[in-house]
């Protein structure tokens, strides 16, 4: 049975953290609105047999998951390191993002396959409540654009949320247009065509997340710092007393934390302390936040 302390750690503390910050409260409010309307779209989509509306609800599901992960990660990443998690728990966001991205790519692919089947064999769609629900989804996304328009210009995290909502808005526009074409023109093919459009938006929006999170988990040298690191290595080799660089390893622990380990061979008459200081400055200038240096003297 879960203890009260465990319940507080898992749920109450993150909630208090979210409510204590204005930006987090804004994200949480939009998450609640988005989640509620996502359920409405799923129910209406299944009742009306509209694959386009179900696809839009899946896109909203992705955004809800991304918002929830971001909120929880903002709390858990601030927890101090301990004997079990020596680096802290910053990779929670990376791992969750990877799982989320894989799931959405699979969902997008399945929707495309189902859409192709419906293009070949169009099915009747009930438009009685479809237009109202699809317009409502568009209005929810417009509210999101207004919510995050300011953060779009000031913060990378806010910009990411804004772009997710913008893609959602485009998907909602597609659903509204397809609904109008079905209602007034009888073009049943508009629904699966809209679904394919939304699926492409879903996959296109998650591919960068999938690639980035996979590269972090595989400990790839971070793309954003590659040129700076090359320049830093050249400057390290020019440092007085440095003979060579051995066993260089650079990787990202999180999206923003770059880690490096370095084994330097220096001349026997060089000042190791001064060499470490100069090399540390060069690594810091290259964007490395945590590094381990091993300096070994060799005879000239």
Curated annotation (Swiss-Prot):
It is found in: Vacuole membrane. Residues 48-50, 113-128, 182-186 are vacuolar. Keywords: Ion transport, Membrane, Transmembrane, Transmembrane helix, Transport, Vacuole. The keyword Membrane applies. It is a multi-pass membrane protein. Pfam families: Cation_efflux. GO terms for cellular component: Golgi apparatus; membrane; vacuolar membrane. InterPro entries: Cation_efflux, Cation_efflux_TMD_sf, Msc2-like. The chain crosses the membrane at residues 27-47, 51-71, 92-112, 129-149, 161-181, 187-207. This is Metal tolerance protein 12. It comes from Arabidopsis thaliana. The lineage of its organism: Eukaryota, Viridiplantae, Streptophyta, Embryophyta, Tracheophyta. The gene is MTP12.
């Amino acid at each position: 049975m879960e203890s009260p302390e465990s319940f507080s750690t898992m749920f109450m503390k993150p909630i208090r953290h979210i409510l204590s910050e204005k930006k987090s409260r804004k994200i949480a409010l939009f998450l609640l609105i988005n989640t509620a309307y996502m359920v409405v779209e799923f129910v209406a989509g299944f009742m009306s047999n509209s694959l386009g509306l179900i696809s839009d609800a899946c896109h909203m599901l992705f955004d809800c998951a991304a918002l929830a992960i971001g909120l929880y990660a903002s709390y858990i990443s601030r927890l101090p390191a301990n004997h079990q998690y020596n680096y802290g728990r910053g990779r929670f966001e990376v791992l969750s993002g990877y799982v989320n991205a894989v799931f959405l790519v699979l969902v997008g692919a399945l929707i495309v396959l189902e859409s192709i089947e419906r293009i070949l064999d169009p099915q009747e769609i009930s438009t009685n409540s479809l237009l109202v629900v699809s317009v409502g989804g568009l209005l929810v996304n417009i509210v999101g654009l207004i919510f995050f328009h300011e953060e779009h210009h000031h913060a990378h995290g806010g910009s990411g949320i804004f772009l997710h909502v913008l893609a959602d808005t485009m998907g909602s526009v597609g659903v509204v247009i397809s609904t109008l074409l079905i209602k007034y023109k009888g073009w049943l093919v508009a629904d699966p065509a809209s679904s394919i459009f939304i699926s492409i938006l879903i996959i296109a929006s998650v591919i960068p997340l999938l690639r980035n999170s996979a590269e972090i988990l595989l400990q790839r040298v971070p793309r954003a710092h590659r040129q700076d690191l090359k320049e830093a290595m050249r400057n390290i080799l020019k440092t007085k007393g440095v003979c060579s660089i051995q066993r260089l390893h650079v990787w990202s622990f999180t999206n923003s934390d770059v880690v490096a380990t370095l084994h330097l061979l220096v001349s026997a008459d060089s000042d190791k302390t001064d060499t470490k200081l100069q090399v540390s400055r060069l690594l810091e200038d290259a964007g490395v936040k945590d590094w381990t240096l091993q300096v070994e003297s060799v005879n000239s």
